[in-house]
Design a protein with these regions (language model features):
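Short, small-residue-biased leader/transition segments that mark boundaries at the very start
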Residues: 4-21
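Short, small-residue alpha-helix embedded
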Residues: 83, 144-168
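Phosphate-handling active-site elements
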Residues: 134-135, 161-175
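Conserved phosphate/ATP/ADP-binding segment of small-molecule kinases
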Residues: 56-134
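Glycine/small-residue-rich loop that forms an oxyanion/phosphate-binding "nest" at active or ligand-binding sites
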Residues: 17-18, 22-66
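Charged C-terminal helix
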Residues: 169-200
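Short beta-strands and strand-loop turn motifs
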Residues: 17, 41-48, 75-84, 137
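Short pre-catalytic strand/loop immediately N-terminal to key active-site residues, enriched for Gly-Thr
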Residues: 134-148
Length: 200
């Protein structure tokens, strides 16, 4: 693919079981080493919105040691950040700073901790560690259950913005605004967690 097309960024999401990771990601990682100039956006999908684990502990360890290092941006939610860094809680500013330090030691260049699962009922606050600074990016929290796929959509929007030439901070702010509108104008379809409106 890279011999025929020009890639401006690479996005990685749910990678499945450890066997799947070993079989497929070794091939991907080997290819990526030839294109280190291309930023990798890594969304470590480990826990579903309902709280179910999507990766087993051995798969998570393999993921952290072999996939996370070298990525340009990692976008965990609060639960995933807690699992990866082995922190019991991430609530205070001090917790956020400690969490970012742990991610740095694991090999992550930049990290966006998504606060959609926080206890704040009025705002959804994300924290971005970029160029050795911590930025707070907040958005209004809407009273809706139509939030299925918010994390995946956010990382995809950031990836698209980076491909368009935005720096990481602007790309993240723009993506956050897009997510807010997609949730605000979401669809009421079926039961449970409904879909966003990606065409907002």
């Amino acid at each position: 693919f890279f011999k025929q097309k020009t890639a401006y960024e690479i996005s990685l999401g749910l990678v499945g079981s450890e066997m799947c990771i070993r079989d497929r990601m070794k091939t991907v990682t080997k290819s990526l080493k030839k294109f280190k100039h291309i930023p990798i956006i890594l969304d470590p999908v480990m826990i579903s919105k309902s709280g179910d684990y999507l990766l087993k502990s051995d798969s998570i360890n393999f993921f952290v040691k072999n996939i996370l290092p070298g990525s340009f941006l990692v976008t965990p939610n609060l639960h995933e950040a807690s699992i990866i860094t082995k922190m019991k809680k991430i609530k205070t500013k001090k917790d956020i700073e400690e969490c970012f330090n742990k991610f740095t030691k694991l090999g992550a260049s930049n990290v966006l901790i998504k606060g959609g699962h926080s206890e704040d009922k009025n705002k959804s606050i994300d924290y971005l560690s970029f160029n050795n600074k911590i930025y707070t990016i907040s958005g209004k929290r809407y009273a809706t259950s139509n939030t299925h796929g918010t994390g995946c959509t956010l990382s995809a929007a950031i990836s698209g913005n980076i491909a368009l030439g935005m720096n990481l901070l602007d790309a993240t702010k723009n993506a956050k605004q897009f997510i807010n509108m997609a949730i605000k104008n979401s669809f009421n379809i079926g039961k449970g967690y409904g879909p966003l409106n990606h065409f907002t």
